[in-house]
Amino acid sequence: ETAAELAEQRFDVEIVDSGTVGSHLGARARKQASRQLRRLGCTVTDNHMCQPEPGMLTIWTAGFAPVTVPCDPPVSTSSDGRIVVNRFLRSPTDPRITAIGDCAAPPAPHLRPSCASALSLGAVAADILISDVLKTPPPSNTGVGYVMRCVSLGRNCGLVEHVSPDDVPNGPVLTGRTARRVKDWVMDRTTQWLIEEAQRSGSYRIVRGPAQ
């Protein structure tokens, strides 16, 4: 996304990836993204490691690292330091602890760090905690999922890939200005969903995924 924005402003941009640019996308979406980057004049080098030369402006995007949360006493964590939780988002080591977001490792391998995950997991956690307070049974379905992946490819172009609830590409790929407008709508709604949920609890509609 950053490369496309810079290239659109007439900067010379080279993307170097130790893997494949857009590897998280399906084949059709990845092809469309590569085509747009070439159209903007980006040079793309896959499966390569390099050392930036002095004087070059380098934007390093090395992926996500979870925020570690110290607990006393310590709780079970995954290999990358996230708090292991069950399908009710509780630590099996200490059920008093509810963990959500990038610091948590739920039993759902399809979940990825994203606002889409955070919104639905936050709503599920709220339902679970409310059931604790009201002493009612917790929700039976705590699985969350996805509808699409949105990517910005410059100010006037985007990419929207439809996916199944477990994040597998399963439909058409939308590109161009229309896809960019969808991306902008999602960005605007993300903030609005939070505001509406604060004003009226339960108004956010959870995107359901595979049962955990």
Feature annotation, model-predicted:
Residues 52-53, 57-120:
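FAD-site-proximal beta/loop scaffold in flavoenzymes
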Residues 81-98, 142, 155-166, 171:
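FAD-binding beta-loop-beta segment adjacent to the flavin cofactor pocket
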Residues 85, 100-154, 160:
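A conserved FAD-binding loop/helix module that cradles the flavin
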Residues 155-212:
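C-terminal auxiliary extensions adjacent to catalytic cores
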